[in-house]
Amino acid sequence: MTVVNFSKAGRALAGLFLCAASMGASADIILGHSGDLSGTSAALTTDYVRGMNAYFDDINKKGGVRGEKIKLVSLDDGFNPDKTAENTKALIEQNAVALVGFRGTANMLKIVPIVQGAGIAQIGNTSGAKSLRDPYVPNLFHVRASTTDEIEAAVNHAWTIGINKIAVAYQDDAFGKEGLDALTAAMQKRGAKPVAVAPVPRGTVDVDKAVDAIAAAQPQAVILIAQAKPNAAFIKAYKAKGASAQFMVLSVSSGLHAELKEPAAGTIVSQVVPYPFTELGNAVVREYQTIISATPDKKFSYNSMEGFLNAKLVVRALQKTPAPLTRAKLISTLETFTSEDLGGFALTYSKQSNLGSRFVNLTMIRADGTFAR
């Protein structure tokens, strides 16, 4: 597979045009990706793309889709919604048949009108936002469960083990605010409310005010609705104050240990894809492990597993779409996936639903960075 991957947006766009020009007469299937390759979630984005690349490479080695090779063009948006919109327009103009694996709720909300105006599918993204699911948003096809599903699982677990004094620090953007709403609703169902609520500015690690506000409330648990870097900064600062609590984070922060190391131990992380390390009873996990083991970076991870599943869904849809391939035909095919099993991971779509999966599993970070279930 040819992968065009640029860490600077200006350079990326220039490279994209050159790449597209060279591909103009070919029958290659062009897929477009925009993500944070240089900002606070760069490591997670890169790992996600690694999973997509691994699967696309494997398909191309086997002859591609009806003899056509898949080409992924990946552009850096630095987690900036305006840059995501710019990249999206460029990818559409250069004949991408679908957009895959985007990151960020604000980023996704920014591109919805662009995607719908172009009649192109956006397949798989890392946002669990309700606003991208309910009411139904045409042209989006989610792979992961929603943030609401993740938070409900976390709160339910807390209640089960006798924790009901919960505080929340949230990323001050659409993602964080929707997560806060989901947490508030989950606690209201149980006749409670958060004991403290504190925002963290988007795209920063400015956590001191949030740490002070939450530590003063002495919660039993703190749910962090943010990316890995600010979450790591929060936990480090919170522990430095001598305060203690059970920390709980969402799947977008599964790279927490890489940022925080041993102090991340004991943190509960909700996961939205199957356990990628030893769950050999799951067919798609076995396939993932076999393919990833044949790549230069043989490391198994949740982020690359999610990217892998996204790529597998894309290829399944491409294979089932009748030739000649068009954006509209691909969307129509995806809408027929009312119960599409990727090998132990099922996805559900229709003309009025883009939910995909509701799979959530809770894990705990060990001191060495591995996950216990």
What is each PLM-predicted segment?
Residues S22-S26:
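N-terminal signal peptide c-region/cleavage motif recognized by signal peptidases
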Residues I30, A43-R50, G63-S131, P201-T204, ...:
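Beta-alpha junction/loop-to-helix N-cap segments that form part of ligand/metal-binding clefts
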Residues S41-R66, A182-Q188:
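Short, polar/charged alpha-helical segment
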Residues I235-G307, F371-A372:
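Extracellular/periplasmic periplasmic-binding protein-like sensory domains
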Residues A294-S304, V315-F371:
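Segments of small-molecule ligand-sensing domains
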